[in-house]
A protein has these predicted regions:
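Short, small-residue-biased leader/transition segments that mark boundaries at the very start
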Residues: 1-4
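Conserved positions within compact, well-structured domain cores
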Residues: 8-211
């Protein structure tokens, strides 16, 4: 299944999207980001985490910092080159490129079936701390140990931690405006794919699948 060009023209900041030669080019206003695509079973996934700072209607996503932090407002966190989105941003339904969706529970469960629950075949070779669970990246999914944002116990804010140890992905529910019961968690010390607890303070990565 392939697309030469899809042209979406909202009133402001037109969005251009192309899917050709296993590359997704996501153009949102002046922001242009390309994502390699990998096919696993019958699914087409982005091979890198979403890293846009604009919604797919061209509007800016708020960067969450200690000076403007609010757990109820939509936004993203940034650490190094990594982008993490909070729950409020994810459930806007406006993060994924047109024609794609944030991976939902059905997509993740099908992926688990394809790989027989072996998280090692999803892990890229970069950043993971050494353990007996050795990444193989046999699928080309290229999951990276980006770390996650979680709640600070002492106050109402978020903190970045577990770099090199964990990566967690948002998992959508029945629609793109609701999350499933748990996210998807990969750890450095096990091949098992675990559930990631949610809260309004979490900042997790996003992977997309074609609709």
């Amino acid at each position: 299944r392939s697309f030469d060009l899809i042209h979406i023209s909202p009133p402001i900041n037109p969005v251009l999207l192309s899917f050709k030669k296993k590359i997704l080019s996501d153009v949102r206003g002046s922001e242009i980001i390309t994502y390699p695509i990998v096919k696993i079973g019958t699914q087409y996934w982005t091979r890198k985490n979403l890293r846009t700072t604009l919604y797919n209607d061209g509007k800016k996503i708020t960067l969450k910092t200690t000076s403007n932090y609010s757990k109820s407002s939509a936004g993203y966190f940034k650490e190094s080159t990594f982008i993490f989105y909070n729950k409020a941003a994810v459930i806007t339904g406006k993060l994924a490129p047109k024609g794609w969706k944030i991976a939902d529970n059905e997509a993740w469960q099908l992926l688990k079936t394809y790989i027989e629950g072996d998280g090692a075949v999803l892990k890229g070779n970069d950043l993971w701390e050494k353990s007996e669970s050795v990444p193989t990246n046999a699928t080309g999914f290229n999951a990276i140990a980006t770390g996650i944002f979680t709640k600070v116990k002492e106050n109402d804010s978020s903190i970045y931690q577990f770099a090199g140890k964990y990566t967690a992905y948002w998992n959508m529910g029945a629609t793109q405006k609701a999350v499933a019961e748990n996210g998807i968690l990969l750890r450095y010390d096990t091949h098992e794919i675990k559930g990631a607890a949610y809260s309004d303070y979490c900042g997790y990565s996003v992977r997309c699948v074609i609709e």
